[in-house]
Amino acid sequence: IGAILFERTMDGTAGGKPVPAALLDKGVVPFIKIDKGLEAEENGVQLMKPMPELDALLARSKALGVFGTKERSVINSANGAGIAAAVAQQFEVGRQVLAHGMMPILEPEVNIKSETRAECDAILLEEMLKNLEGMDQQVMLKLSLPVQPGTFDALVDHPKVLRVVALSGGYKRPEACVELSKNRGIIASFSRALLEDLRHQMSQDEFDAALGEAIDQIHRGSTQKA
C-alpha cells in the first residue's frame, strides 16, 4: 500500500513523528506530489508547470524517508505532437527523480471526457514504449483506464516498469472498479473514488463502514480480474 502526500502533509507530524516515518511504521509506502499544476492547453495537452525548486524538494523528501514521487499532466485530445511532448516531459522529470534515488510515478492522464479517448490511448502507448526504451532504471506509471481493456498490457509487462496503477479519473467508484477489473496487472490508485461516500456528519462507525466498503471494492477491482 502506498500513500501520495502533498508537500505540506509530508512536512507535518503524526503521533510525534514525521508523517513519512509514521506511514512507514504502518507498512505504507510514502510518495510526494511534486508537480505545481498545469499549463494552459496547447496541442491538445496540458503540460506541467516549471518546477525550479524540484531538486531541493527531492533532497528534503528523500531525507524524510519518502520513497517516490507523482507528477501529473493531462491529455485532452489525440494530437500526436502534444502527446509526445507530454510524455517526453514526464520522462525528463522522472530522470531527475531517479537521480535522487527515488521512484517516479509518471502520470500522463487521458481525460475520460475526451471525444478521442481511444486514439489518445493508442498514441500514449506508442510514446510510452518509445521513451521506455531509453531508460536504464524502472519507473512506475499512473494511467487513465483505457477505452479498450488490455491496451496497456505491453506496459504492464515491460521490464522498465515497476508497476502500472490506474487513476479513477472522474468515474464513480463502481464503474471505476469494473473497468479496473478488465485490465490485468493494473491496480488502483484512486482518491476521489475512495472518498466519494464519506461525509463529515457521519458517526465513527458509519465512517469506518463506508471507508471499509470502498477499500474492499477497490481491492477486488485490483486483484480479481475479469
Q: For each predicted feature, which ranges?
A:
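Eukaryote-skewed repeat-based solenoidal scaffolds used as protein-protein interaction platforms
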Residues: T69, S73-K142
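Alpha/beta catalytic barrel-like cores
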Residues: I1-F67, I75-S77, E127-L143, V147-A226
